[in-house]
């Protein structure tokens, strides 16, 4: 994460990363799963027996802060579980006028910074980034309970 923050500071002076969510203990994941079971929002959660990468400490949710310390508008809010949050649909949403070129530019800066730190983007959440191979993480690392 430090590599991502350093890259951003070098390439976009004044802008910083803001961590919104990181380590999520297994018990919290189970509680979220139970609360959202049977709703469309459950599609955005990892099934607890499989495990969220957050529960292994290998995922982070981040956004950008501008030079004044304000969150940069990304077209949707953090944890807004809608199609407009999906990076995979950005071009389509831009064409429909549901996202702006500025939203995509800001998301692009965030992704570039995170990729320079070795993170991978999730196709359904512009704010979520995984570190490492999910299968290897689940097979070889302990979960925080």
Residue ranges and their predicted role:
Residues 1-145:
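Cell-envelope/glycan interface and biosynthesis
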